[in-house]
Amino acid sequence: MRILGINISHHSSSCLLKDGEIEWFMEEARLAKDKHHHIEYFNGGFYGSKLLKDIDHIDHVIFTSFCSKWHDWRRIACCLQAITSQGCSFGEVIFDPYEHHLYHAHNAFYASGFDQAIALVMDGSGALYKPMVDIEGGFYRESESVYHCEYPDRILPKERHYSAYEQAAIEPVTEGINTLSNTFPAALIFSRVCESFGFGARGADAGKVMGMYAYGKPDVYKNPWYIKSKTGHWITDNTVMYDDMLPFFDGERDFQKQANIAYKLQEETKKYTMSKLHDIIDKYNPKNIVLSGGYFMNCV
C-alpha cells in the first residue's frame, strides 16, 4: 500500500510511504529551485509529482495545510492533476483543514521517543476556528494548543487558543477547551517584526531578528507587550506593541533601534513562553513536554 502525504502550506513538501516505509521525502523548494516555493495553482504547482513517473497507483493521498479559507481546494486540485499527468492513479483523498496543530503535535511526539508527553504547540497561523469560518470577519486561528499524547495512538486536545490579531486587545472568551482572544501569537510577533524591518514574513527570516537580539539593549522599550487580562490569561497589548514597531513599518532603518526591538521581542516572548510552560506543569504534572509549531521551529 502506498500513501502520499503533501503539505500545501508554505515551505511545501511531500512524502511517499510504501507499506509504512519511506520511499522518498522531498521539499518542493529543491525541485522548483526556489528557496521559498510553495504549491500554488499559478506557479508551477506540485513539482513532487515528477517523482511519481514510475508509479502506477497511490492508495491514499493526504493533504495538510494551515487552512487557507479560499485556496486550499484549488491547490489540492492542482496536485491531483499533476499526479495523473504522470500516469499515476490514486484512491482515497483525505484533507482535514481544522487540525493543523494536531499535525504539529504528532511530529513532536512521535519523533521524541517518549511513550507519554504533553505537547505544546505555538504557531503563527494555525487552522481557522470552525464555528466561525463562514462568518464575515471570523478569522480566529489556532495560535497555541496543548495535547496529551500516549503511545501508540492516543492524542487528546486539552487546550486550544484561537487569536484574531486585531489592533486592540479584548478580554478572552472561553468555550470548553477553546479560548478566543485578540492576542498576537509569539510566532506572529516575530513575523510582524520581520516585516517591519523589511525582512521576509511567515518566520522565514526570524533567525535574522534573533541575531540582532545580541546587539540590543535592555530597558529601551519599557512598556510591556504582554498584560494579564481579567480572566487570568496573558494577552498582548497590541497598541503598545504596534506603537513600538510603527517607525520601522514607516521605513526607519536604524540598526541599534532595530536591535533594541529585537531584544524586547526575544525577552517578552521568552517570559510568556516560560509562563505557559509553568502553567502546563501546574495543571498536568507531565512526565515529559514536547514542543512544536512555527514558534519553536523558526523563532527559538
Could you say what each language-model-derived stretch is?
Residues M1-V300:
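Short acidic/glycine-rich loops and adjacent helix/strand connectors
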